[in-house]
Regions:
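Intrinsically disordered, low-complexity Pro/Gly-rich regions
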Residues: 1-21
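Transmembrane alpha-helix entry/boundary detector in multi-pass membrane proteins
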Residues: 29, 33, 50-73, 92
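Transmembrane alpha-helical segments of multi-pass membrane transport proteins and ion-pumping complexes
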Residues: 36-48, 74-79, 103-111, 159, ...
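Cytoplasmic membrane-interface segments at the C-terminal ends of transmembrane helices
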Residues: 22-23, 27, 49, 76-96, ...
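C-terminal binding/interaction regions
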Residues: 108-176
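Loop-to-transmembrane alpha-helix initiation sites
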Residues: 68, 72, 91-95, 147-157
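Pore- or pathway-lining transmembrane helices of multi-pass membrane proteins that form conduits
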Residues: 66, 94-106
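Cytosolic juxtamembrane helix and N-cap/initiation of the first transmembrane helix
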Residues: 15-39
Length: 176
């Protein structure tokens, strides 16, 4: 017969707590929706600014306004997502996607508004029927038909600003 070994008084691991666990901090879905609505508003304001000033703009001014719009869109979206979504990485990533799309659609909507103002509603209807992706093609290329590298740079700036600011603000907040 083997000798008996003494029993341990407690298990070697801590037992899980009883009761409900506290909810995770932040509201990632609400943060994404709030960022989306803010991005739509910033993009509409940018489109209105371009519509009001397109006759007096040089290429340098247009590119500067586009990059400024992308940074502003990313900063506002990132700030809101960081405040509401806290440390949720998925909310930060979706904020970057939303900010980049806001920069793209702000530019393409401005092109359509300028076309409607300068040539009338019939031109927009023809555009929709025969060349629906023309605003995106105009966003991607410059006047000579070459790739306009300010366009993807604006997307990168918007996404980086949104993710970076959301990450900084979200990680600064304390978890309960």
């Amino acid at each position: 017969m083997q000798p008996m070994y003494p029993m341990h008084a407690a298990p070697p691991f801590q037992a899980p707590p009883f009761g409900q666990r506290p909810n995770a901090s932040g509201h990632p879905v609400g943060a994404v929706f709030l960022g989306f609505f803010a991005s739509v508003i910033v993009s509409l304001l940018y489109s209105g600014l371009i519509l009001a000033t397109y006759k007096d703009q040089s290429i340098t001014t247009a590119n500067t306004l586009y990059l400024g719009h992308a940074l502003l869109n990313g900063a506002i979206v990132g700030w809101l997502i960081g405040l509401v979504g806290h440390r949720n990485t998925a909310a930060h990533v979706w904020g970057a996607v939303i900010a980049a799309l806001g920069a793209l659609f702000g530019y393409t909507n401005a092109i359509v508004l300028v076309l409607a103002e300068s040539r009338g509603g019939g031109a927009v209807w023809d555009l929709v029927r025969y060349e629906p992706f023309w605003p995106a093609k105009a966003w991607w290329t410059d006047n000579s038909g070459e790739v306009d590298w300010f366009s993807p740079l604006g997307l990168v700036l918007a996404a980086a600003a949104a993710w970076g600011i959301a990450h900084l603000i979200g990680n600064r907040r304390r978890q309960p």
